[in-house]
Amino acid sequence: MSQRNQRKVYVGRVVSDKMDKTITVLVETYKKHPLYGKRVKYSKKYKAHDEHNIAKVGDIVKIMETRPLSATKRFRLVEVIEKAVVL
């Protein structure tokens, strides 16, 4: 059996679940400034495939890179790490 190649795995917060079987995940990370060396926080949104519509807005989720599923979707939901607190 061949082993699957290394894939990008990100942890982020769901900011939108309005689409069917698709969630938008905000991933925040730090990047070092090339000249000054200060860590700068930046964020990026990824669309991810959620087959069973499990994730809701505010959930912390893990997403993994996969083959292109649409024009903008290149990730799929692996697991919901933490459910959002509903007040």
Curated annotation (Swiss-Prot):
One GO biological process term: translation
One Gene Ontology cellular component: cytosolic small ribosomal subunit
Signal peptide span: none
Highest taxon in the source lineage: Bacteria
GO molecular function, one term: structural constituent of ribosome
Classification via InterPro entries: NA-bd_OB-fold (IPR012340), Ribosomal_uS17 (IPR000266), Ribosomal_uS17_bact/chlr (IPR019984), Ribosomal_uS17_CS (IPR019979)
Pfam families given in the database record: Ribosomal_S17
Keywords: Ribonucleoprotein, Ribosomal protein, RNA-binding, rRNA-binding
CDD domains listed in its UniProt record: Ribosomal_uS17 (cd00364)
Role played: One of the primary rRNA binding proteins, it binds specifically to the 5'-end of 16S ribosomal RNA.
NCBIfam families: PRK05610.1, uS17_bact
Subunit: Part of the 30S ribosomal subunit.
Protein name: Small ribosomal subunit protein uS17
Protein's gene: rpsQ
